[in-house]
């Protein structure tokens, strides 16, 4: 489902380096303060853009230097994610991970004593998750069986940008959240320094899998429409480094580790003043709660 009718400003043209090699425009939506990938694939055609050994978010094995960095960073970020969630809730809270992939975060939360389950559209990812621990990750249709106002926390770790109908999904997830509950939403930030540096080669544009590209201003507007508000934000420090590493390959045809480390360092350094980190986690609550 198309979210916007006002894709009214060409911003950049990007290539799908990971899978298809196709070119897509990024158009700035002045009313929403965000970018939209244009044209957007039909929902039925989206899955083909995820069917590649180069697309690693659902992968199990290391095949390259970037894969090794990705898996190492994932371990560190899961610890940080658990820390952010635990700062709001005691053990035993109910956590729904929307877009759970192969279930790493769900299993980690369960190991910490939380009641946690995941929802995931990709059947292969669900099969991997449930082979490690049965009945951990379910098809997204399972959302209809979840009781309203039953979840202490709902997490979307780099998921929102993939959702064709993200506003409808957020509205549905809001109904599942307890009055005192929180949404934890991580998204890339196209206003970051590393995005500006790499331009069309910035790996976090990841067209056309990333249908939307958010700014802090866009996130404030989105949740204001839902009668929710951003309570706080957390920087995802490591994203600047591994996104920069993959971006160097898109830019030059090979990984440039030292350049990636330098650009990642500069991005995080500049963000200490601007707040524009490569990726941000938004902690969102119901207004007046």
Model-inferred region functions:
Residues 1-64:
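N-terminal juxtadomain amphipathic helix
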Residues 11-21, 232-289:
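A C-terminal cap/extension of S-adenosyl-L-methionine-dependent methyltransferases
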Residues 32-33, 41, 217, 286-289:
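Short loop segments at secondary-structure junctions
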């Amino acid at each position: 489902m198309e979210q916007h009718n006002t894709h009214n400003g060409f911003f950049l043209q990007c290539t799908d380096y990971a899978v298809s090699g196709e070119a897509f425009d990024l158009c700035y939506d002045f009313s929403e303060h965000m970018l939209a990938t244009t044209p957007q694939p039909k929902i039925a055609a989206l899955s083909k853009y995820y069917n590649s050994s180069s697309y690693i978010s659902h992968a199990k094995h290391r095949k390259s230097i970037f894969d090794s960095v990705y898996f190492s960073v994932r371990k560190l970020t899961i610890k940080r994610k658990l820390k952010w969630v635990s700062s709001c809730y005691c053990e035993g809270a109910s956590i729904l991970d929307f877009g759970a992939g192969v279930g790493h975060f769900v299993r980690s939360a369960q190991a910490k004593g939380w009641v946690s389950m995941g929802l995931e559209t990709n059947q292969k990812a669900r099969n991997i998750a449930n082979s490690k621990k049965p009945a951990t990750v379910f098809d997204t249709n399972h959302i209809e069986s979840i009781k309203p106002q039953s979840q202490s926390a709902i997490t979307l770790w780099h998921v929102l940008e993939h959702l064709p109908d993200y506003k409808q999904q957020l509205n549905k997830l809001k109904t599942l959240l307890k009055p005192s509950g929180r949404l934890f939403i991580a998204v890339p930030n196209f206003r970051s320094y590393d995005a500006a540096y790499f331009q069309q080669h910035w790996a976090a544009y990841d067209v056309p899998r990333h249908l939307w590209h958010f700014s802090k201003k866009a996130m404030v507007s989105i949740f204001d429409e839902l009668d929710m508000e951003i309570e706080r934000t957390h920087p995802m420090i490591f994203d600047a480094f591994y996104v920069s590493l993959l971006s160097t390959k898109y830019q030059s045809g090979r990984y440039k580790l030292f350049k990636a480390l330098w650009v990642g360092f500069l991005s995080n350094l500049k963000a200490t003043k601007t707040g524009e980190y490569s990726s941000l986690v938004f902690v969102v609550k119901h207004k007046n709660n």
